[in-house]
């Protein structure tokens, strides 16, 4: 396997559109890197530049110690898995998996060994004689991965490989891909717009927007310590709630005023806000759905007075309940205990866990404190 280095990578099309802008990333050997972001953010374009399917307009791409900018795709020692499987319909599973090795004139006994080992890893041993039309979507995707595995490449590139599968199969295939990474110790770069895939699969995640890298970090850090408003809103489902808040001083302490509600700000966050010159200014307060509580015990322990609203929508998802209600004219989502007594149309009393709150600069959208 191999490390990768992307230094000041740019992609500009002939019409002047900049798809990727000054992309910098060092990928260690055996890492599982996720490129995530909304459609059109440049993640697939970056992957295709690594593969050699798109020309690099500027910057340097290295795999190991070798500069790859002008190396043909077939000579880069990478394998790519696409979302549409790209299987040959007239070939069996065995022949689809063996095809790339046959083109390279690998000896038959080595091909057979590689195919059967990949089939064992992917639980395809009983399907080797079938043709793609006789396979389910999940089985076809496993064959596409098997075709990549038999080549034993330095780097695996995966471009939204699960997007054509239903929800249940996506969960199963996420587990399969994690197992493959553990078994092979492979370097994997994986593109998705699904932040659940990103959070569950990646050792590190690259969040992109409009061709620009917003933040690179572990899933846990991206969730708990987002670097800006976009990352905070993109990572997490349901997304973080955002409310305008005026930072004020009261009795020697800082509070966040959200409409008529006064929320006590914990000391460390208060210091960051004061040091940043935000007293008297409007900032964006971020609070995740799971950090809004309607339990009487939490409300009584909260240093701030309870907030009130009316439940607009109640959603039961088995192990959890989502409540939707307004705070100062903005819709807020709370993830609460399923034993809650609140229902649609009911008045609700609740409190924010301000220890878990986030504050963002309203102009720059950068994080002030997490």
Name each model-derived stretch.
Residues 16-18:
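Short coil-to-beta microelement around the adenine-binding A-loop and adjacent beta1/P-loop entry
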Residues 36-38:
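The feature captures the beta-strand-to-loop junction immediately N-terminal to the Walker
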Residues 51:
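Helix-to-loop junction immediately C-terminal to a conserved catalytic motif
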Residues 57-60, 110, 210, 357:
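Conserved coupling/switch loops of ABC nucleotide-binding domains, chiefly the family-specific signature
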Residues 59-67:
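Conserved ABC transporter NBD signature motif
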Residues 73-230, 234:
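ABC ATPase nucleotide-binding domains
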Residues 253-311, 331, 341-370:
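Glycine/charge-rich catalytic "coupling/switch" loops of P-loop NTPases
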